[in-house]
Every structure is written in structure tokens, then in C-alpha cells.
Amino acid sequence: MALHRSAGADSQSPVILIFDGEVWARHGLIGAVEQAVRAGDLAPVHLVLLDSGGRERRWRELDGTEPIHRYVAEALLPWLRAEHGLDPAPARTCAVGQSLGGLASLLCGLLAPRVVGAVVSQSASLWQEAPARALAELLERDGAQALADSRFVLEVGDQEWVLTGPHDDFARELRRSPARVEYLRYDGGHDYACWRGSLIPALVRLYPAD
């Protein structure tokens, strides 16, 4: 794990949890975030780049069978508070991921909304049923009132044929909840070029500079 603080970030500044953080470090995410902050577009943030640990560990931890939301809520965020003094409101804690990381981000937002109040999910592996199942249970229980203050940004490329249908279905069901939902489809595929191009704008929409 790596932690990067933007200039001007304080204990209440947004915390952005990035799955597959070591990959994003290679793709220049820190520099792109800093450029957006310096330009006055993005509020100062704390980037928490979570290492995937390799292919096998990534599949084991992010495929929806492990309770990743519990790790985030019960271990990671308390550690960031105790060791680094980061104590943002839930609305200022955002889980970000792509593919399996997108699936994990959705589970954090659905199952731990008291601490993770925002999600940016790009090309989530929604052929896995865990997010749809979790959302269905929330809707059946009480109309997913736990998501009343939550925000979700969902993105998928039109060339990701296996994912567009599940994303359409998931977005439709998520809009039955009180959460604020932004669903974007773009002409692209399952790759970092597409994801990077839309990630910074998504963060700016969630956390614009004052």
C-alpha cells in the first residue's frame, strides 16, 4: 500500500481508495491527480493505492467471495485514522476500481455505506453475482435506505460485450435505491487508456475544488 497526500490536504480531505494501486502508480495516476489539484479542478485528496498482491491474490480477495468491505471498514480505514490522522466523512471516502477492482468497490459502497459513501466503478466484473445479490437484498429489506447519502459512478465500454448487459441491469436496479447514480457508457473497451481518461473527470465531479 502507498499513501499520497495532495498539497493542501488535511484530515477531512477526501480519501480515495484505489484498488490495483501499483498498476495505477505505473500509469501516472498520482501525477494526473496533482495536475487536477493544481489546476483548481479537484479538491486536495489523499490517494491510498492498494497493492493487488499479484494475480492469484487479486482473484482471491476481489472476486466477491472474500468480505473486502469488512477489511476496508474494520481494518484499513481505522488504521488510516490511527496512523495517519485521516478521518473524512463517509461522503468523502471513495472506493475506486476497475474490473475485479470495480466489483470490490461496488461491494464496499453497498455493504459499508456508513464509511464508504462514494464509488467509482469502471468496467466492473458484474458477471460475478455478488454486487447484484447484495443490492437485491438491500432493496428487498427497506428499499436500500442505507444508500440514501451514497454516490455511485458506473462506467462501461460499449465494446465490452459481456459487461454491458449486466451493467445496464445493475444501474437500473441501483436507481431504485435513494443513492445518486451516474451511469456512463462510452465507445471503448476493457483497458487502462479508457479508464484513465474518465477517472480524473469522475473524481472532479465527486470532489470539485472549492
Task: Give, region by region, the residue ranges found by the protein language model.
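Non-catalytic cap/lid and distal C-terminal segments of serine-dependent acyl enzymes
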Residues: 1-210
